[in-house]
């Protein structure tokens, strides 16, 4: 895991000036910050595994997946593992297909994560979404956690919406216009605001 992004401290100062709730959260959660794993393949696998299941279930499946890979989660290793072995890890047929196709695209050089460095956020989301089992939410998680993009606001994320409801005393789901208002307010540091909102509802900081 790497250090926090270069923009982190500037973002905290900016958000504290912009919003009272954000100031309260930033002052409360001083023990940690966004940690980055500079391994796109690893993070994509983790994102696919974590789709539509609880955090605890995702962690359990990922642990078994890591053991199946003998602690070497890379395209060549994953490409060589039989689907039957991945099924025993607790992966659904769709997720196995997504992970296997991802590994194959890496091995055959049909997917190049370095291209994302030259793309804006929307271009990168489109490029990542071309991968099987990777939709907008998964692409946003990759941009936030792996590429450290500063202005990701994942409005499809249940945790973010719940945190907005809790902290701003709104119904669940919070009104779309209010979520959009916060987006504009926190820009260009929505990723940092998202991280602190997540932190307010989860004892352990989220990592990918």
Annotated model-derived regions:
Residues 1-32, 122-123, 136-145, 149-208:
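C-terminal accessory module of base-excision DNA glycosylases/AP lyases that mediates lesion recognition
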Residues 10, 17-71:
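A positional/architectural concept
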Residues 21, 25, 54, 58-130, ...:
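Alpha-helical ds-nucleic-acid-binding substructure associated with the helix-hairpin-helix region
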Residues 34-42, 90-94, 183-190:
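Structural motif
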Residues 43-48, 64, 81-85, 123-127, ...:
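A general alpha-helix detector
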Residues 44-49, 99, 103, 142-143, ...:
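Short alpha-helical scaffolding segments that buttress acidic/His motifs in well-ordered protein cores
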